[in-house]
Amino acid sequence: MTTMITLRRRFAVAVAGVATAAATTVTLAPAPANAADVYGAIAYSGNGSWGRSWDYPTRAAAEATAVKSCGYSDCKVLTSFTACGAVAANDRAYQGGVGPTLAAAMKDALTKLGGGYIDTWACN
């Protein structure tokens, strides 16, 4: 009986050690490719239609894709970003925001608009 408990305990300790090592490896792993190396954009039309793009090699390419995806001749870029972008809306207006995280981009857009809600977002 004592041998069985000892083996179970050794196994549990070994599993815990492997789990800790795996968690440390995941925690310390380098971040994926720099978000600053790619661009995204969000474009809006006066009728509320929008287009988004992300993971483009240049700002111009990201903006052109967002405008094209929007699909209307009056589409204009509201925000361009390297990490995350969001667009806040209310009954009267739309406002773009950017940030290093989605939460930061949403907060930026809502702050610039003075309230409202998040209509769309994208991150690289």
From Swiss-Prot:
Keywords for the protein's UniProt record, in alphabetical order: Signal
Record Pfam families:
DUF4189
Is-annotated flag, keyword DNA damage? no
Do you know which InterPro entries this protein is assigned to? DUF4189, TAT_signal
Choose one Gene Ontology CC annotation of this protein and give it: peptidoglycan-based cell wall
How does it get modified post-translation? Predicted to be exported by the Tat system. The position of the signal peptide cleavage has not been experimentally proven.
Region forming the signal peptide: 1-35
Family from the record: To M.tuberculosis Rv1813c.
Name of the protein described by the UniProt record: Protein Rv1269c
Write the lineage as a comma-separated list: Bacteria, Bacillati, Actinomycetota, Actinomycetes, Mycobacteriales
